[in-house]
């Protein structure tokens, strides 16, 4: 009888040890299986989960616009007063709903090339008004004239066309005209072969961004989705040194197994440069753990604050010898037009940027850019890209519409918020196919290890106690 009991206790201890060992072995083996599966499914080729969502995003992406409506145009034109603006919006468009085109795999370089077609559909139910709403805004053509034609003789000639067209420093335009283009009356009179249609995003509809060539990750998963070339080049020709390089992905996804210490680099054609995001917080998005990466203030810092930005300073006067921060001159990639990009309301910008503009109120929560990235797959499941489009206007003695200005203005035209969040159906699918299976495997590992250890200890204690009793 004693033998049977001892044998049973020993058998229980052995079973517990086996369970514990199996649970311990399952941890690295399970992690290896997960890694192998993820590496297979994030490759950009036919048949993978990543490829299906990469060709055409399953997430609804919206671009909201807020327009800075100028309230005192005459005061500014005559007296060079502060510009009083009233923010109006949001006006919402659905974007990025078209599938990638001309997708071509290159098995030799392990890359895939494509075009991303552009399109925008107005969403009245998500907007405060219609595309026909009218705003008083800076006259884009008149403001650009002194920058494009610094020669005073040329400015005198242009002034005659400006006067004849009855153009001034400010103009009234509908939302549709401002965003997507209108025939400018001043430019229409210029007898040179120039583009007479102008708009903040003109041309956009029926155009395409690219050609992009990105690594498909088949030979090296750490390079998946990273851009190899853009429009056939590895650099942009807008900046000097390393600032001109095209780095990272397009921010829709990143190589898998993202760590908090990683700096996520991505390229944005909207701002004509590569940029980066750093870890901010852990967040739960529809039951999926994600890492929030934020665009740091250092990204638009002056070279004095962040020496790495020295090659983004392209001139010394407007930038006040490269000390101005929070704004980026992208004129070189806008055909020389004096276009400046910043965060909305000059968030993280030099105080002198907002000083000549009334009614700006920068807010970190509303105006910062972030990416919510699922760390195992590297997929971006939610994002908010926020930026402001500004235009420089300078005094010009030979142009009557600008001759009374006493100083330069970097005038905010509009700011946008482009957002996308994984839908409920896609989130459930993601939980079932990825996070759910990983969590289940982790639970099985812990249960096996815990139960095995408890069984082994309990049966061994019982066995030792039984033997001690027999000896006594």
Curated annotation (Swiss-Prot):
Disulfide-bond pairs as recorded: 243-311, 272-333, 313-322
Biological processes annotated in GO: amyloid fibril formation; amyloid-beta clearance by cellular catabolic process; cell adhesion; cellular response to diacyl bacterial lipopeptide; cellular response to low-density lipoprotein particle stimulus; cholesterol import; energy homeostasis; intestinal absorption
Mod. after translation: Palmitoylated by ZDHHC5. Palmitoylation is required for proper localization at the plasma membrane. Ubiquitinated at Lys-469. Ubiquitination is induced by fatty acids such as oleic acid and leads to degradation by the proteasome. Ubiquitination and degradation are inhibited by insulin which blocks the effect of fatty acids.
Chain residues carrying a lipid of type S-palmitoyl cysteine: 3, 7, 464, 466
Region (Required for interaction with thrombospondins, THBS1 and THBS2): 93-120
Catalytic activity: butanoate(out) = butanoate(in); (9Z)-octadecenoate(out) = (9Z)-octadecenoate(in); (9Z,12Z)-octadecadienoate(out) = (9Z,12Z)-octadecadienoate(in); tetradecanoate(out) = tetradecanoate(in)
Bilayer-crossing regions: 8-29, 440-461
Site (Critical for TLR4-TLR6 dimerization and signaling): 463
Location of region: Interaction with PTK2, PXN and LYN: 460-472
Entry keyword annotation includes tRNA processing: no
Glycosylated sites: 79, 102, 172, 205, 235, 247, 321, 417
Covalent link Glycyl lysine isopeptide (Lys-Gly) (interchain with G-Cter in ubiquitin), residues: 469
Source domain of life: Eukaryota
Keywords, comma-separated and alphabetical: Cell adhesion, Cell membrane, Disulfide bond, Glycoprotein, Golgi apparatus, Isopeptide bond, Lipid transport, Lipoprotein, Membrane, Palmitate, Receptor, Transmembrane, Transmembrane helix, Transport, Ubl conjugation
GO molecular function, one term: low-density lipoprotein particle binding
Membrane topology: Multi-pass membrane protein
Record localization: Cell membrane; Membrane raft; Golgi apparatus; Apical cell membrane
Record's GO cellular component terms: apical plasma membrane; brush border membrane; caveola; cell surface; Golgi apparatus; membrane; membrane raft
Function according to Swiss-Prot or TrEMBL: Multifunctional glycoprotein that acts as a receptor for a broad range of ligands. Ligands can be of proteinaceous nature like thrombospondin, fibronectin, collagen or amyloid-beta as well as of lipidic nature such as oxidized low-density lipoprotein (oxLDL), anionic phospholipids, long-chain fatty acids and bacterial diacylated lipopeptides. They are generally multivalent and can therefore engage multiple receptors simultaneously, the resulting formation of CD36 clusters initiates signal transduction and internalization of receptor-ligand complexes.
Family: Belongs to the CD36 family.
Subunit structure of this chain's protein: Interacts with THBS1 and THBS2; the interactions mediate the THBS antiangiogenic activity. Upon interaction with a ligand, such as oxidized low-density lipoprotein (oxLDL) or amyloid-beta 42, rapidly forms a complex with TLR4 and TLR6; the complex is internalized and triggers an inflammatory signal. Through its C-terminus, interacts with PTK2, PXN and LYN, but not with SRC. LYN kinase activity is required for facilitating TLR4:TLR6 heterodimerization and signal initiation. Upon interaction with ligands such as diacylated lipopeptides, interacts with the TLR2:TLR6 heterodimer.
Name under which the protein is recorded: Platelet glycoprotein 4
């Amino acid at each position: 009888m004693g033998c049977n009991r001892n044998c049973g206790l020993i058998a229980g201890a052995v079973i517990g040890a086996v369970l514990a060992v199996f649970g311990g072995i399952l941890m690295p083996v399970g992690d290896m299986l997960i890694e192998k599966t993820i590496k297979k499914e994030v490759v950009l080729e036919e048949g993978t989960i990543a490829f299906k969502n990469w060709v055409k995003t399953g997430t609804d992406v919206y671009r909201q616009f807020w327009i800075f409506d100028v309230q005192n145009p005459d005061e500014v034109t005559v007296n060079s007063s502060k510009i009083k603006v009233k923010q109006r919006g949001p006006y919402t468009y659905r974007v990025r709903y078209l599938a990638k085109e001309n997708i071509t795999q290159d098995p030799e370089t392990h890359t895939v090339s494509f075009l991303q077609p552009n399109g925008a559909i107005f969403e009245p139910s998500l907007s405060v008004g219609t595309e026909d709403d009218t705003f008083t805004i800076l006259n884009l053509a008149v403001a650009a004239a002194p920058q494009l034609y610094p020669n005073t003789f040329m400015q005198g000639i242009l002034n005659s066309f400006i006067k004849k067209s009855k153009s001034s420093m400010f103009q009234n335009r509908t939302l549709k005209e401002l965003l997507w283009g209108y025939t400018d009356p001043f430019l229409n009179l210029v007898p040179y072969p120039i583009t007479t249609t102008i708009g903040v995003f003109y041309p956009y509809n029926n155009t395409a961004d690219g050609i992009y060539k990105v690594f498909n990750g088949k030979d090296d998963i750490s390079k998946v989705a990273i851009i190899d070339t853009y429009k056939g080049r590895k650099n942009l020709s807008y900046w000097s040194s390393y600032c001109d390089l095209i780095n990272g992905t397009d921010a829709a996804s990143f190589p898998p197994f993202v760590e908090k210490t990683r700096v996520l680099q991505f390229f944005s054609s909207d701002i004509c440069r590569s940029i980066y995001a750093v870890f901010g917080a852990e967040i739960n998005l529809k039951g999926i753990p994600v890492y929030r990466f934020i665009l740091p203030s250092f990204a638009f810092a002056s070279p004095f604050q962040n020496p790495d930005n020295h090659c983004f300073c392209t001139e010394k006067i407007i930038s006040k010898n490269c000390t101005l921060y929070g704004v980026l001159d992208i004129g070189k990639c806008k055909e020389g037009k004096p276009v400046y990009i910043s965060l909305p309301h000059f968030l993280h910008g030099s105080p002198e940027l907002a000083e000549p503009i009334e009614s700006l109120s920068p807010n970190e929560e509303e105006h910062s850019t972030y990416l919510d990235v699922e760390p195992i797959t590297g997929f971006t499941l939610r994002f908010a890209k926020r930026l402001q489009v500004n235009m420089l206007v300078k005094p010009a003695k030979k142009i009557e519409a600008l001759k009374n200005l006493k100083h330069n203005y970097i005038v905010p035209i509009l700011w946008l918020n482009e957002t996308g969040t994984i839908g409920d159906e896609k989130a459930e699918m993601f939980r079932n196919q990825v996070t759910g299976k990983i969590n289940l495997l982790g639970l099985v590992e812990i249960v096996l290890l815990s139960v095995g250890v408890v069984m082994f200890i309990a049966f061994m204690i019982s066995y030792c106690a039984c033997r001690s009793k027999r000896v006594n």
